[in-house]
Amino acid sequence: MYKKYFKRLLDLIISLILIIILFPVMIIVAFLLLVNLGFPLWNEKREREGKNKKVFIMYKFRTKKLNSEKLTYRNRYTDFSRVIDRVRLNELPQLFNVLKGDMSLVGPRPFIPGDNLPEGEISAKRYLVRPGLTGLAQVNGGRGLTHKQKLEYDVIYYDNLSFKTDFKILLATITNIFKIDRD
């Protein structure tokens, strides 16, 4: 019942409240990133696969320098943009994706269309729910996990999807935001 009816309702209510509360923060972050990195403000080509493999544009502030693919990881960011990336403030615009219904607050993180993911039941389960702003994989290793490990966490999430699971993941996400990771 939660997955079918209440999850989306909670996504709508919570994302709207968070957008209202955090909008001034988004404006300040956008301005400071503009000063630090210039235009464009948004990451380009942010197509992602969502529920039922529907492709959507994921909103996210740009924190890397333009044409930085050939630079070392450390040189891709300014000091300021690295901080924004580490505390995930660049992800705040995804609240609009949640409001639109492309994403949920909690769920598997969306993959890029065409990523070489294994076929079969494990991979298919992740597409039965909306992708999330945060998820079980993000609170259990995030960027340090392989695609296979992320898929395993996605299946665990799907099999245990409940209000309690979502609440625990949201609390763990808030805790993780305030931990400083060292690159």
Describe the residue ranges of each PLM region.
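Amphipathic alpha-helical recognition patches that constitute DNA-binding helices
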Residues: 4, 53, 79, 94, ...
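C-terminal terminal-structure detector
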Residues: 2-5, 12, 127-183
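Short, hydrophobic secondary-structure boundary micro-motifs
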Residues: 29, 43-44, 106-108, 114, ...
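Short, glycine-rich, amphipathic interfacial segments at transmembrane boundaries or analogous
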Residues: 41-82, 133-153
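A hydrophobic, helix-centered structural microdomain
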Residues: 1-65, 169-183
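Short glycine/serine/threonine-biased micro-segments
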Residues: 22, 48-51, 99, 105, ...
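A short, structured surface patch at a secondary-structure boundary
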Residues: 71-130
